[in-house]
Design a protein with these regions (language model features):
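Charged interaction patches that mediate protein-protein contacts
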Residues: 1-2, 22
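N-terminal small/polar-rich segments of proteins
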Residues: 28-116, 121-170
């Protein structure tokens, strides 16, 4: 009888070990965990664009009262901007240091997307001039009004200018 219980005990231990090996690993397995640090970095993003092609401002009439040429005006260009930066401004500049004729630019009908338009800017040199201030974390737009002015003393001629718009600190 002693041998019978010994075999039962041995068989029971073997059966338990087999069951643990076969099924117990799933029931008693340890979970594995891995961690990762993810850095999110958003860089300052500025975009500026123009809707409208090249312009030709033609002065071709005289003001009868002042005996001076009437200015040529065009407001068909739209300026669009987006910036996620703080305290930005939009500056405008020309590539001509000493222009012969006067060109003025005014930002009109500014959208609610941020920015305050400065008064009309005269491009009398090639330095940048503030056009819109207070652009901050926004997308906005405005119409650009160009005014070309000539004096009779300046005579006739053509002058082509490359106008540059820049979002910058300010």
């Amino acid at each position: 009888m002693k041998r019978y219980f010994t075999n039962i005990t041995s068989n029971l231990l073997l059966a338990t070990a087999f069951a643990w090996i076969a099924f117990g690993q799933h029931a008693y397995s340890q979970q594995a965990t891995a961690t990762q640090v993810v850095m999110l970095r958003v860089m300052e993003l500025n975009k500026i664009d123009l809707v409208g092609g090249p312009l030709t401002l033609q002065i071709n009439s005289i003001n009868d009262n002042a005996a001076q040429p009437n200015p040529a005006i065009d407001a068909s260009t739209k300026l669009l901007w987006t910036s996620n930066g703080d305290a930005r401004k939009i500056a405008v500049g020309s590539d001509i240091a000493s222009p012969r004729f006067i060109l003025k630019i005014e930002a009109e009908k500014s959208s609610s997307g941020g920015g305050i338009a400065e008064p009309e800017v005269t491009l009398s040199d090639n330095a940048p001039h503030d056009l819109i201030l207070g652009v901050q974390r926004s997308a906005g737009s405005c119409q650009l009004k160009f005014t070309a002015i000539a004096d009779v003393k300046q005579g006739t001629g053509e002058e082509s200018r490359l106008i540059t718009y820049t979002i910058t600190g300010g």
